[in-house]
Amino acid sequence: MMIESSSQDVASLVIALRQQQVIAYPTEAVFGLGCNPDSESAVQALLALKQRPWQKGLILVAAHYAQLKEYIDDDALDDAARSRIFASWPGPVTWVIPVCPTTPSWLTGQHASLAVRVSAFEPVRRLCLAFGKPLVSTSANLTGQPPARSADEVRGQLGAAFLVLDEAVEGRLNPTEIRDALSGELIRQG
């Protein structure tokens, strides 16, 4: 089911998230698949839909830094790392940050870190604010296929078993840049 972006429709997406369902929504460059990061069953459903191995880990996208603090080890960040991160947020840069001991492996995969982003893109911010926490965010496509850039492309690749927020992506040509928070090293060009 495709839905427009009224407050009622955002409420429908939040209900789906609270019911451990997968949703699709526009991001800065492509459509994302998202779910409740605290629900192992929701994350497993997302990984199965995308045909993505759990070992790779996932990205969390948030409306503000405070939404990420229960998942990452904030104390691992020195002043230089904080400066790099906060100079780019909110915005289209994803940072890989060490995690708290309680962060579940269904988010981190085989890593001791987690990729996180505070988005400036309004549809993502609205969803995260309405949900009250970050969302798992991974490109809406089958592993190995091109990412979907429209709601119709999401349906074409992944079917119609979940809600899709039918809005345009922000328009960036490339996925978000990914950097290591501790070193500043570029992991994926944006």
UniProtKB/Swiss-Prot annotation:
The keyword Chaperone does not apply. The keyword Membrane does not apply. SUPFAM superfamilies: YrdC/RibB (SSF55821). GO terms for biological process: regulation of translational fidelity; tRNA threonylcarbamoyladenosine modification. Its EC number is 2.7.7.87. Residues 7-190 form the YrdC-like domain. One of its GO terms (molecular function) is L-threonylcarbamoyladenylate synthase. It is found in: Cytoplasm. InterPro entries: DHBP_synth_RibB-like_a/b_dom, Sua5-like_dom, TC-AMP_synthase, TC-AMP_synthase_SUA5. It catalyses: L-threonine + hydrogencarbonate + ATP = L-threonylcarbamoyladenylate + diphosphate + H2O. Keywords: ATP-binding, Cytoplasm, Nucleotide-binding, Nucleotidyltransferase, Transferase, tRNA processing. GO terms for cellular component: cytoplasm. Belongs to the SUA5 family. TsaC subfamily. Required for the formation of a threonylcarbamoyl group on adenosine at position 37 (t(6)A37) in tRNAs that read codons beginning with adenine. Catalyzes the conversion of L-threonine, HCO(3)(-)/CO(2) and ATP to give threonylcarbamoyl-AMP (TC-AMP) as the acyladenylate intermediate, with the release of diphosphate. This is Threonylcarbamoyl-AMP synthase. The lineage of its organism: Bacteria, Pseudomonadati, Pseudomonadota, Gammaproteobacteria, Enterobacterales.
